[in-house]
Amino acid sequence: MQAFRQRIRQTVPEMRRVKQIHFVGIGGAGMGGIAEVLLNEGYQVTGSDIAENAVTSRLISLGAKISFSHHAANIEGASVVVVSSAIKGDNIEVITAHEKRIPVIQRAQMLAEIMRFRHGIAIAGTHGKTTTTAMVAMIYAQAGLDPTFVNGGLVKSAGTNAYLGCSRYLIAEADESDASFLHLQPMVSVVTNIEPEHMETYHGDFEEMKQTYVNFLRNLPFYGLSVMCADDPVLMELSSQVGRQVVTYGFSDEADYRIEDYQQTGFQGHYTVVAPNGERIDVLLNVPGKHNALNATAALTVAKEEGIENEAILTALAEFQGAGRRFDQLGQFIRPNGKVMLVDDYGHHPTEVNVTIQAARQGWENKRIVMIFQPHRYSRTRDLFDDFVQVLSQVDVLIMLDVYAAGEQAIAGADSRSLCRSIRNLGKVDPILVSDHKQLAEIVDQVIQDGDLILAQGAGNVSKLSRELALAWGKE
């Protein structure tokens, strides 16, 4: 390990006067990934969170010291305190750090510091950035470039969401939710799409959000590269404002890297990418859906522009196992009413839910879709209510859980009962509201039929519930 760290230091100097780094909210995937990279670079890492999870367990195994409560004493010895966007200014550890004149910085500021002396590749966008980040990382690894990566979700092929490599490359998911991605100074920026989301950050103004993305892309040096999805009208509107080289990808005829002949069979997708020079590249993916073809083509575009050989690109994409909780097959199960397949998916925005439904329809056209949906946040349910009603009406059976509040107060008319009422009034599906999670297994067994595909959908604890179902059912 010492020799490895010496190799790193040839490229990336140590942060001056920083020995111990404390993370408040260390259990988040983005926070934990940065903490893991810094641990492996040789820094002392401490942290705090309200509960243990897989991220904290991994960090503890790597040598981090973590407290599962917030106390002033937790920051003892810290040179700097890193906070997640979920941590408020009245947190006792933040207050104590200010009193002791210890720098308090956002997660993205520390990520920017890790990126400072590296060739940074930042992947942003409303949807698809976690999967795209994972795909870029796997391509660069397959090409022998040994990249460092920090992702917001598990990279299944690597078994982790962060890794410290020896090369100059850093591949990172860029977070627009609090506009902190403006701290990053990458060499390559990818934007997958832009939709209204996290609008409280942008004062409810979509124009402000769009301008923030332009500012993010202008952080590139004049010789940097901006990679954009040509299928997204907002991105194409903004492309002329960036003032940097722009390369596009997508199904659009106008895309520089154009997707043709997409076909899906089950979990497999097949398609051809036509490169700017006319080269035709046949791609095989083992993750379903046109949205994943877009994610993969974004990654392919970055790699081709870097000069990576097709063999490494295509091998990495064919072997890509997905990102955590993205159309995650939990197994096939024999139930009293027949055999069913259970899939867990993180998508919690109407666009994300829609592409998951479309991937299921295209890959398993003869199966009924039974969705267990858990709305995430009252504010999102309120802001996107009509879109949720339309999208959720596409499934064959809808089991609706109560809104996962994520710390928010309830908002009148933005609850699951109101959603169910509006969906029922549309007349396409009759939702079943399940407020008591203990009843979920029984209700699922009542509604399923032989051959059904069950989608557990949402960003709250519906994933935990789906895994409890899988454990109770046992695989066939």
From Swiss-Prot:
Binding-site residues, ATP: G125, T126, H127, G128, K129, T130, T131
InterPro entries for this protein: Mur-like_cat_sf, Mur_ligase_C, Mur_ligase_C_dom_sf, Mur_ligase_cen, Mur_ligase_N, MurCDEF_pg_biosynth, UDP-N-AcMur_Ala_ligase_MurC
One term under GO cellular component: cytoplasm
Single Gene Ontology MF annotation: ATP binding
Entry EC number(s): 6.3.2.8
Main subcellular location: cytoplasm
NCBIfam families per record: murC (TIGR01082)
Family under the similarity heading: Belongs to the MurCDEF family.
Function: Cell wall formation.
Protein name: UDP-N-acetylmuramate--L-alanine ligase
Gene: murC
